[in-house]
C-alpha cells in the first residue's frame, strides 16, 4: 500500500515501500519485552499504557506481562539484547507494601519490540541495518519473535518521517519481521490534530499524549484490533484519548493492507 491520501503526502513525494510482514506469528502474546531508549522511557514508560490497554480489553488475556529495558540516548548497537532475554532474573521477583520479597514465575518472552536511536536510521554512517539483522537473528534462534517499532519525526523536523519510515520498513522486510508504524501515526496526528501536542518541550521526546498514541498503535499492530472504546485513557482527557485511539487504528489498519 502506498501512503497516499489515506495516510500522508510528503511534499508531493509519495512513499510507496510496503511492509511485507503484516502481523506477528505469536497469537495474542502474553510476555513482551520492549528494548530501546528514552523514547519509550518517558512518562513512566510506553509499556505501562500498553499493558493497561490489554488488561482493560474484555477479549484479551489478563495474565499479561510486559517489561522494558532502556538506556538513555541508546542505539541498538549499545544494547546486549540476547543477554536480556536469557537472564532468568528479569521479572523474577517484586516487593509488597511491607517490603517482603515475592518470587514470581518467569516465562520466556514471546515477542521483543525494539527501536533504534532517533537519527540512527537516517544517518548513512550508522550501522542500523546490520545491528537489526544481528538482533533479529539472535532472537529467532532462541524462539523469540523480533518486532521493530518505527520511531517518529521531531516536531520541528516533520520531514524526518520520509526517511525514517523507509528505513524501518526496509529493515523489517530484509529480516522478515513486523514493523509497527508508530512514527506514521505521529506524523498523521500532527497533521490532523495540531492542538494535541505529542511532544515535550524539546520537540523530540513524547508527551503523555505521545506515549499513549504509541501504546495504542502497538496494541493495534500486535492484536489486530482497534483500541477504540477501551476505557483506559492514561489520565488524558477522554476526547483526546478517543481521538488518538481512533487514529492509531486507522493508521495501523491501512499500513498493513
Enumerate the predicted regions with their spans:
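Conserved small/polar residues in nucleotide/adenosyl-binding loops
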Residues: 1-6
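Alpha-helical cap/lid subdomain in secreted, periplasmic
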Residues: 96-208, 212, 216, 220, ...
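Conserved catalytic region of serine esterases and O-acyltransferases that act on ester linkages
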Residues: 205, 216-257
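Soluble non-cytosolic domains of exported or imported proteins
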Residues: 26-30, 40-48, 122, 126-130, ...
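Cleaved targeting-peptide boundary
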Residues: 17-25
Amino acid at each position: 500500500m502506498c501512503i497516499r491520501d489515506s495516510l500522508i503526502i510528503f511534499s508531493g513525494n509519495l512513499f510507496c515501500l510496503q511492509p511485507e510482514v503484516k502481523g506477528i506469528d505469536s497469537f495474542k502474546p502474553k510476555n513482551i519485552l520492549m528494548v530501546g531508549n528514552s523514547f519509550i522511557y518517558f512518562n513512566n514508560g510506553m509499556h505501562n499504557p500498553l499493558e493497561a490497554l490489554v488488561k482493560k480489553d474484555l477479549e484479551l488475556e489478563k495474565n499479561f506481562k510486559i517489561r522494558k529495558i532502556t538506556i538513555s540516548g541508546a542505539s541498538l548497537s549499545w544494547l546486549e539484547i540476547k543477554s536480556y532475554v536469557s537472564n532468568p532474573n528479569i521479572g523474577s521477583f517484586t516487593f509488597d507494601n511491607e517490603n517482603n520479597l515475592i518470587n514470581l514465575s518467569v516465562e520466556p518472552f514471546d515477542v521483543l519490540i525494539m527501536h533504534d536511536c532517533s537519527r540512527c536510521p537516517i544517518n548513512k554512517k550508522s550501522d542500523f541495518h546490520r545491528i537489526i539483522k544481528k538482533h533479529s537473528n539472535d532472537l529467532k534462534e532462541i524462539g523469540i519473535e523480533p518486532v521493530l517499532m518505527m520511531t517518529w519525526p521531531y516536531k520541528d523536523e516533520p520531514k524526518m518521517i520520509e526517511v525514517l519510515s523507509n528505513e524501518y520498513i526496509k529493515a523489517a522486510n530484509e529480516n522478515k519481521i513486523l514493523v509497527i508504524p508508530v512514527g506514521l501515526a505521529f506524523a498523521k496526528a500532527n497533521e490532523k490534530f495540531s492542538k494535541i501536542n505529542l511532544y515535550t518541550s524539546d520537540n523530540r521526546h513524547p508527551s503523555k499524549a505521545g506515549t499513549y498514541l504509541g501504546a495504542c498503535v502497538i496494541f493495534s499492530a500486535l492484536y489486530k484490533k482497534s483500541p477504540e472504546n477501551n476505557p483506559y485513557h492514561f489520565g488524558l482527557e477522554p476526547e483526546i484519548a478517543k481521538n488518538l485511539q481512533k487514529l492509531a487504528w486507522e493508521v495501523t489498519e491501512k499500513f498493513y493492507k
